[in-house]
């Protein structure tokens, strides 16, 4: 059925409270108290106000221990902490701030404190300018390397993310039309003007303590009238004599050989030449990091 109305709304006064009304309400409560019945209080105090209006006027403006004015930094921190844990339960927050009303705290949050919090979380205005300036001041060679690598990185449209080096190798060998390049550390890339090479890095073995990185190099070696397709695998690793590590390398090599046998020499040439027509330079790792080489001939 719903709650019964606290008063006859047709015969009560609405709008701002006058100083005379404030004086009547304050004088009555100081002498008689609330009596626990706010519905009957307006009639006893001689006010044409609703009981709810009298209660809010007393709690938010007229009670003697109420505090008005600016909030301190300590109060701000308490409001931040409680708001993060319980949300906008202003009456509960007001219970932790002596002399503050839930109405004052709510108004203070909406008008000042929330804006102050947002301003502290926003990045400084010169942040984006600094990023743009540092990007434009990069050397032309570094910028060209960055653009080339971005344009040649393997991309999987179904998952909307870059492929791992091992996935990139498999997709290239399965008939992709574009050449795939991958490099984890851009500082290790330099130009090599002598040959057109396809360099791909293998996936780092996370289960091993030693660093195990590799690349696949496909090159054309012409000797007299004969042309030999050479697959060179360059191993760069810290020496590890563990037998399990050795067997893992042999499995990797045999898998690559099976994939390569499915493609003829002309198909491999076409894959290499299609990616190198726009530039005669190729990417190569720092030779100082190469420890040993293994040659597989086909």
Swiss-Prot record:
Disulfide bonds: none annotated. GO terms for biological process: blue light signaling pathway. It is found in: Nucleus. One of its GO terms (cellular component) is nucleus. GO terms for molecular function: DNA binding; DNA-binding transcription factor activity. Changing residue 256 to S: In strain: cv. An-1, cv. Ct-1, cv. Cvi-1 and cv. Wassilewskija. Residues 38-62, 90-113 bind DNA. Residues 9-62, 63-117 form the HTH myb-type domain. Keywords: Activator, Developmental protein, DNA-binding, Nucleus, Repeat, Transcription, Transcription regulation. The keyword Transport does not apply. The keyword Plastid does not apply. It comes from the Eukaryota. Ubiquitous, with higher levels in roots, flowers, and shoot tips. Found in all cells of the shoot tips. Its main location: nucleus. Transcription activator. Positively regulates axillary meristems (AMs) formation and development, especially during inflorescence. PANTHER family: OS09G0431300 PROTEIN (PTHR48000), TRANSCRIPTION FACTOR RAX2 (PTHR48000:SF28). This is Transcription factor RAX2. It comes from Arabidopsis thaliana (Mouse-ear cress). The lineage of its organism: Eukaryota, Viridiplantae, Streptophyta, Embryophyta, Tracheophyta.
